[in-house]
Amino acid sequence: MKYEDINENTIKITLSFDDLTDYDIKLSDFFGNQEVIEQFFYELVDELGLENRFGNVGMLTFQIQPFPQGVHMIVHEEAMLGEGGEIPDDPEEFEELMTGFYNKLNEIGADMARERGITDFKPGLGLPGTKKDEAEQEPDFIYYSIRYEDIMSVLTGIKNVKFADEESEFYRYDGNFYLVVLDNQKEKGKMHVESTRSRMMEYGEATKMSREFLQEYGECLIATRALDVLRKI
């Protein structure tokens, strides 16, 4: 497996059939097994450190180009910017932006299927009912935690990323600071919440420390409305 830069927003990953075998991926999976390929894609993104390679201003998308010895995966940073060059905070505007983004991906998938004679391709990204069983199990509210090495990283992050949370708490544990946020997936949509979380993590790091663990073993510095309190500092 190797990759090369195409331009500042695009790279090409070359995977041989032996590489695909190592990941237990078949060529047919690229055209009929969306969940497996999405998981494979994110494994490559993590393994190659591609999130750090790009400018973190959009979503990473990919396109598959088979060749005799394997496949080329063209990875592109797809801009997700609204008017003024920022991701919209309004849930309806964000949903509209994502609808256009998914439509574009579905068009690319349909073109690829047509070129390869695949007649049963069913565009499903972003459509109502996609992964219905998973959607039905999604909680209305979700807690997530972000770890920071120092207080300045916390203050910089929360002042640069503006959003309305349901509740937030602030802890210290083992020399690090932890911000625990409760957000409303039902009202904002899962993708909007994930986008906010990703922007917050530009100033900190994802952590597996649960709220329950921090409540029991951490030092609670701000028990309620932590974001509001910290923004006033």
Swiss-Prot record:
GO terms assigned for molecular function: protein-macromolecule adaptor activity
Protein family (similarity comment): Belongs to the MecA family.
Gene: mecA
Protein name, entry field: Adapter protein MecA
Job of this protein: Enables the recognition and targeting of unfolded and aggregated proteins to the ClpC protease or to other proteins involved in proteolysis.
Matches recorded under Pfam families: MecA (PF05389)
Domain of life: Bacteria
Species annotation: Lactococcus lactis subsp. lactis (strain IL1403)
Organismal lineage: Bacteria, Bacillati, Bacillota, Bacilli, Lactobacillales
Free-text comment on this protein's domains from its UniProt entry: The N-terminal domain probably binds unfolded/aggregated proteins; the C-terminal domain interacts with ClpC.
Subunit organization: Homodimer.
UniProt cross-references to HAMAP family, sorted A to Z: MecA
UniProt-listed Gene3D superfamilies: 3.30.70.1950
